[in-house]
């Protein structure tokens, strides 16, 4: 399943400038998701991080992983309608073992690879990895819960 940014916005509430997922290229419900964000010098974050030496912030990479994980959790919840999805939100409970292995710069395509470690009811434990040109740049374990708004 491929999702463009319009489809993504039907599932998660994030909007510019905080929507950090441009496209989902693969979803295997209850298993994994692959998606990406194109990093451009026009991203607002580069106005201050860092002038003359732009580096995409690690916390933004983690947030992008979280958004991708939210899509995976929603899509794995069965045949949830757009209306049902609109009445729910994903809260992240913890981010553990976060590591940043290489800088991400303007011009990079940041690929998120998210996989389910465990799911029990509304609680999801996910393994998140971020790559640029198949080089691991960041990883973390994410725990999230889907709740009513």
From Swiss-Prot:
The gene is fabZ. This is 3-hydroxyacyl-[acyl-carrier-protein] dehydratase FabZ. Its EC number is 4.2.1.59. The lineage of its organism: Bacteria, Pseudomonadati, Campylobacterota, Epsilonproteobacteria, Campylobacterales. It comes from the Bacteria. It catalyses: a (3R)-hydroxyacyl-[ACP] = a (2E)-enoyl-[ACP] + H2O. NCBIfam families: fabZ (TIGR01750), PRK00006.1 (NF000582). The active site is at 49. It is an enzyme of class 4 (lyase). One of its GO terms (molecular function) is (3R)-hydroxyacyl-[acyl-carrier-protein] dehydratase activity. PANTHER family: 3-HYDROXYACYL-[ACYL-CARRIER-PROTEIN] DEHYDRATASE.
């Amino acid at each position: 399943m491929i999702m463009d940014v319009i489809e993504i916005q039907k599932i998660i509430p994030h909007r510019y400038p905080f929507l950090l997922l441009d496209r989902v290229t693969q979803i295997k419900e209850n298993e994994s998701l692959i998606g990406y964000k194109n990093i451009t010098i026009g991203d607002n974050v580069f106005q201050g991080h860092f002038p003359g030496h732009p580096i995409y912030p690690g916390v933004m990479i983690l947030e992008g992983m979280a958004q991708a994980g939210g899509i995976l959790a929603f899509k794995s919840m069965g045949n949830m309608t757009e209306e049902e999805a609109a009445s729910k939100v994903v809260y992240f409970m913890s981010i553990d073992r976060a590591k940043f292995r290489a800088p991400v710069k303007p011009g990079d395509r940041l690929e998120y690879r998210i996989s389910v470690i465990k799911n029990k009811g509304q609680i999801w434990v996910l393994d998140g990895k971020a790559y640029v040109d198949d080089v691991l740049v960041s990883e973390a374990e994410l725990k999230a819960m889907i709740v009513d708004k």
